[in-house]
């Protein structure tokens, strides 16, 4: 589940795994965390996934799915608190313009980022619910890019990850949007390991 609108990683995974080996499911959910949560819960019931991969802001929604192993790419654990604080900015037209300037919609994005005060206020409870959903015996593993520009702003925080999951992560020499070489060398082998797939 991608955050924002980027679907490059799941689309690339689809090309790497034949459908008879692994079905990669890509769905677009709402930026409103409550609406998105209801959509995702319905899809989980329908698809019955064996693995959930959360990217960026999508990591927060992924954490709320229980009973399956989790992998994460650039999990944005610091985002809910920052988005909640940004709700005040979203009360003003200039503030909404600023937020869209900071997080622009790119061509091909699947998810519309709706920076309204009402929606952003929901992210505090959304983040708290995600942490509360962590299972003591669950499987959680993450990948962080050393050149991830969101680490400077506190959106992506390895210290927060370590607080809840310890050292269950790998850093790679790339950006927030995992490059294909690291998808192939790091993410794919971990997927195979978790699902018990042969090479």
Regions found by a protein language model. Name each.
Residues 1, 53, 143-145:
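Short hydrophobic segments within beta-strands
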Residues 1-46:
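Active-site catalytic motif of lipid deacylating hydrolases and related acyltransferases
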Residues 2-3, 59, 77-78:
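Residue-level marker for beta-strand->alpha-helix junctions and adjacent short loops that shape enzyme
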Residues 6-14, 62, 153-158:
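Short, highly selective alpha-helical patches that border small-molecule cofactor pockets
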Residues 41, 64-68:
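Glycine-rich loop at the start of a catalytic domain that most often binds anionic cofactors/ligands
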Residues 52-63:
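Gly/Ala-rich beta-loop-alpha elbow adjacent to hydrolase catalytic centers
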Residues 69-71, 75-198:
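The alpha/beta-hydrolase serine catalytic core
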């Amino acid at each position: 589940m991608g955050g924002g609108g980027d679907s490059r990683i799941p689309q690339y995974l689809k090309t790497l795994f034949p459908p008879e080996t692994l079905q990669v499911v890509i769905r677009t959910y709402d930026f409103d965390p409550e609406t998105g949560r209801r959509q995702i819960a319905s899809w989980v019931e329908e698809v019955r996934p064996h693995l959930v991969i959360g990217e960026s802001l999508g990591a927060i929604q992924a954490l709320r799915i229980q009973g399956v192993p989790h992998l994460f790419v650039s999990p944005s654990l610091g985002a809910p608190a920052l988005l909640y604080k940004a709700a005040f900015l979203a009360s003003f037209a200039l503030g909404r313009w600023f937020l869209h300037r900071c997080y622009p919609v790119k061509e091909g994005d699947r998810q519309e980022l709706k920076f309204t005060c009402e929606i952003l206020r929901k992210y505090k409870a959304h983040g708290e619910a995600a942490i509360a959903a962590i299972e003591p015996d669950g499987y959680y593993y993450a990948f962080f890019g050393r050149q991830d520009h969101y680490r400077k702003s506190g959106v992506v925080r390895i210290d927060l990850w370590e607080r809840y999951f310890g050292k269950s992560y790998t850093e790679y020499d790339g950006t927030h949007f995992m490059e294909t070489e690291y998808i192939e060398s790091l993410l794919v082998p971990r997927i195979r390991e978790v699902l018990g797939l042969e090479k």
